[in-house]
């Protein structure tokens, strides 16, 4: 892979679900037989950084989601601290490029599903202090922030009133907004209400695979026109 990646490039995996396996006690510093990512294979593949997904299952209550998110964040810190010879946290682009100069893989944190925010922006502030740098607003179920792409009947018709507050506060804090898993209406609300570009951290093309998790050509063009980017998802069903 080295011939593809120059020293000027920064190769980023924008959504890595491997942290869920940290709860089982795996060591990312060693080659794993399960999963797709560990620090050994990331280095071999020329990956400069990855966003570890702090994922809370949609069936969790808000209280359960908070406890799960904090536990998973703690495990991510343990994993990076225990492999400081190969990895380091990055909370800004500058830190990421500095890590690359040092030969270290950057680990970013992104929260997948906003349920752990509950209905209190103080939780969002706390997660930002913990290192969260993007927020995937929902998963495969509506929540207190917005409508998901999966249930057919909408609850909010896009962002909820609290969801609009979350968008504004993420803009202020510097947390990127991720439209993956969101309904089409939520996507367009994000473009309308966010003052910063929106990302799709793990979405694919609806024209190639007609699945509600994917984005239409029009949505992809509108995202690009608003300065956003999409990272293609390699999940087979999409």
List each language-model region with its residue ranges:
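N-terminal hydrophobic targeting/anchoring segments and the immediately downstream early-domain regions
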Residues: 1-156, 210-238
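Catalytic pocket-lining loop regions of alpha/beta-barrel enzymes
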Residues: 161-238
């Amino acid at each position: 892979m080295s011939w593809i990646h120059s020293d000027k490039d920064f190769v980023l995996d924008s959504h890595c679900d491997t942290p869920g396996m940290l709860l089982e006690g795996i060591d990312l510093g060693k080659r794993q037989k399960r999963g797709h990512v560990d620090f050994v294979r990331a280095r071999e593949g020329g990956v400069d950084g990855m966003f570890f997904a702090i994922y809370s299952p949609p069936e969790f209550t808000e209280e359960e989601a908070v406890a799960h998110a904090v536990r998973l964040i703690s495990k991510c810190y343990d994993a990076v601290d225990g492999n400081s010879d190969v990895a380091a946290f990055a909370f800004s682009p500058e830190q990421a490029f500095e890590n690359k100069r040092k030969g270290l893989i950057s680990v970013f944190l992104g929260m997948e599903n906003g349920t752990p925010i509950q209905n209190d922006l103080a939780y969002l502030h706390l997660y930002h202090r913990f290192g969260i740098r993007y927020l995937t607003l929902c998963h495969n179920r509506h929540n207190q922030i917005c409508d998901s792409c999966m249930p057919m009947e909408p609850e909010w018709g896009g962002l909820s009133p609290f969801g609009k507050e979350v968008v504004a506060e993420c803009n202020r804090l510097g947390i990127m907004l991720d439209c993956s898993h969101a309904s089409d209406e939520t996507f367009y609300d994000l473009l309308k209400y966010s003052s910063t570009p929106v990302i799709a951290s793990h979405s694919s093309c609806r024209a190639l695979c007609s699945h509600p998790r994917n984005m239409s050509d029009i949505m992809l063009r509108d995202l690009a026109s608003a300065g956003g980017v999409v990272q293609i998802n390699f999940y087979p069903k999409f």
